């Protein structure tokens, strides 16, 4: 499945530490030569201060340049002690319960800064030392300590630019520490910061596009670890919003794989009672058709086969390849069974809408099921009230009879209005973007091939 591996497209938009798990996954599934992967892992890790981890891969590389790892350890230890000493005045304060209570009751950062100056003789430089110490902890791979230090820095610091950097660092720390609820909150905070830049460096359209591209990639870790309900639904809501859908189409069309996969995986997931159901599959079919010239793979092509071309024979063959792609994908591998199950459900829905009489044996064959499995599948299919059809099984003829109720004018009007509302939002966003900075002809396609320019700096926590 190396032909469909997205790792090389994803890594330029990730911090080095976030990219390490992707390469470890490739090592586990062995779709690339071991020597090549060891070299890639070494090149990635040597930009960090995780000396023992770097040494591990250095030993696996033939004819590697000699490296004095003992000296690197001594330098890392000395740097750690230096930064720890500079940050110590602030760390003492945040470890003091009485001081923390006073800071929490302060109400805002200006009052807290006055309190720190007057009672603890702490200035801005010492607060910034907390950021640099947290950043260094991150580079050492101590993500728990890094996240804690950056959390307190965000509470105390008045520096908008450093706060943005700390937000990225805290998100990465939460991800690598497996704190998914905290990471989701950080994704929302960063999204708010990026979408409302307030005259900062993010106010420039290109910087905002780059930041949104990073956030889309980093958020994959969060959404696909929150499950098919909260995670996939959250991904769909964010990725299909006009600003972020425009970003995907402009700079990272390969993320369409995860959009389509999330829509299929969560197709039958229970929705909260207060959330209106939205047919993402129909929207995505239009998007996949539009962006086919930029990106296509077996997962996106499967959706097009079913809902655009109605080529169910091709869809059946494509599903087999798509399943292999899903099982080898870092983010999707845990949802392989749900993907296949719901993909079969989509094929069944289309068949039931196209035909009034369906041969159960033929349907089972189309779904790659035995006759017995096919009969059980069809029983479950009939029970699903969201199919929008009534069905009965004729056991004598081994046929499924479909009755379709006609849609009411009101339902048709509502569905049409929803589509118009979504397209209007997309047009409005496109017009606003055009007013902000006109695009040159061909810019969209060029950016799509230059994702590597969005790579975070290697020695910094923040992107």
Curated annotation (Swiss-Prot):
Keywords: Cytoplasm, Initiation factor, Protein biosynthesis
Domain PCI per the UniProt entry, residue ranges: 224-407
Primary localization: cytoplasm
Sequence segments annotated as region (Disordered): 432-463
SMART domains reported in the protein's UniProt record: eIF3_N (SM01186)
Pfam families reported for this sequence: eIF3_N, PCI
Highest taxon above the source species: Eukaryota
Biased composition (Basic and acidic residues): 437-449
Role according to the record: Component of the eukaryotic translation initiation factor 3 (eIF-3) complex, which is involved in protein synthesis of a specialized repertoire of mRNAs and, together with other initiation factors, stimulates binding of mRNA and methionyl-tRNAi to the 40S ribosome. The eIF-3 complex specifically targets and initiates translation of a subset of mRNAs involved in cell proliferation.
Subunit structure: Component of the eukaryotic translation initiation factor 3 (eIF-3) complex.
HAMAP family: eIF3e (MF_03004)
Protein name: Eukaryotic translation initiation factor 3 subunit E
Species assigned in the record: Cryptococcus neoformans var. neoformans serotype D (strain JEC21 / ATCC MYA-565)
Organism placement in taxonomy: Eukaryota, Fungi, Dikarya, Basidiomycota, Agaricomycotina
Gene for this chain: INT6
